[in-house]
Amino acid sequence: MTAATTSQPAFSPDQVSVIFVLGGPGAGKGTQCEKLVKDYSFVHLSAGDLLRAEQGRAGSQYGELIKNCIKEGQIVPQEITLALLRNAISDNVKANKHKFLIDGFPRKMDQAISFERDIVESKFILFFDCPEDIMLERLLERGKTSGRSDDNIESIKKRFNTFKETSMPVIEYFETKSKVVRVRCDRSVEDVYKDVQDAIRDSL
C-alpha cells in the first residue's frame, strides 16, 4: 500500500457489509452465526478460527506467537489479526460475497479503530450479553469434547478478565455511536435467534 492510500479504507460500506459479533467466551456467538449464515448467506469470519488456522499453517512466521497468546488468554497483536481478516474479506469479495459476520473481533479499542480506518466501517455490533456463571458452565461442558486448549477453568477465567478489561470498552464506545444491538443470551437458542433476526432485518 502506498503512502497516498493509507487513509482510505480497503472497501466501501456500500460494497461490503460487516457486522461485528461480540460476547464473552461461551455466550453462544458461534451457534447464532451458523444460523445467520444458513438463513441470510453471510460469510462467517471468526478471528479465533483464522488465528488457529494460521497457528497450524506450515511455515507460518506467527504460529508460535499466536499459540502463546491463545494459551495465556491474551490478545494477539492486531497487525496479525487485521491482515488475516483483510485477506479473508478480499478473497470472499472476489468470489462475489459481500456480507460478513466477524466473530470475536474487535477485542480492543485500537483494533476497532484500525479496522474501520483501514478495512471498512462496520454496520453495527451484535453483542451477546450473557451472565458469567452460564458462560462458565457452557465452556466447561464444551471442553469435555472440543479438544481446545483454552477450554479449561484457568484459561476460561483469564479470558473472562480479558473480555471485561478490553472488549467492554469497545462495546461502550460503539454504544455512544448508537451502533450496538444487545441480545440477552441466558435464554434458549431459538429465543435469542428471534432477537438476532429482528436486528438483521432492521439493519440490512
Curated annotation (Swiss-Prot):
> What GO molecular functions are on record for this protein?
(d)CMP kinase activity; adenylate kinase activity; ATP binding; UMP kinase activity; UMP/dUMP kinase activity
Name any Gene Ontology BP term. Answer: 'de novo' pyrimidine nucleobase biosynthetic process
Q: Which reactions fall under this protein's catalytic activity?
A: UMP + ATP = UDP + ADP
Kindly list the places in or outside the cell where this protein is found, as annotated in its UniProt entry: Cytoplasm; Nucleus
Where does this protein hold a ribonucleoside 5'-phosphate?
A: 52, 74-76, 104-107, 111, 148, 159
Checking InterPro entries in the record gives:
Adenylat/UMP-CMP_kin, Adenylat_kinase_CS, P-loop_NTPase, UMP_CMP_kinase
Record note on pH = Optimum pH is 6-9.5.
Documented EC number(s):
2.7.4.14
Keyword Transferase belongs to the record: yes
- Where is region (NMP) located? 46-76
**Residues annotated to bind ATP:** 26-31, 142, 187
Q: Which cofactor does it need?
A: Mg(2+)
Swiss-Prot/TrEMBL keywords: ATP-binding, Cytoplasm, Kinase, Nucleotide-binding, Nucleus, Pyrimidine biosynthesis, Transferase
Q: Output the PROSITE patterns linked to this UniProt entry.
A: ADENYLATE_KINASE
Q: Which family does it belong to?
A: Belongs to the adenylate kinase family. UMP-CMP kinase subfamily.
Which NCBIfam families does the protein's record reference? UMP_CMP_kin_fam
| Its biological purpose | Catalyzes the phosphorylation of pyrimidine nucleoside monophosphates at the expense of ATP. Plays an important role in de novo pyrimidine nucleotide biosynthesis. Has preference for UMP and dUMP as phosphate acceptors, but can also use CMP, dCMP, AMP, GMP, dGMP and dTMP. ATP and dATP are the best phosphate donors, but can also use GTP, dGTP, dCTP, and dTTP to some degree.
A further note on this protein reads: Present with 1500 molecules/cell in log phase SD medium.
By what name is this protein known?
A: Uridylate kinase
Task: Name its species.
Answer: Saccharomyces cerevisiae (strain ATCC 204508 / S288c)
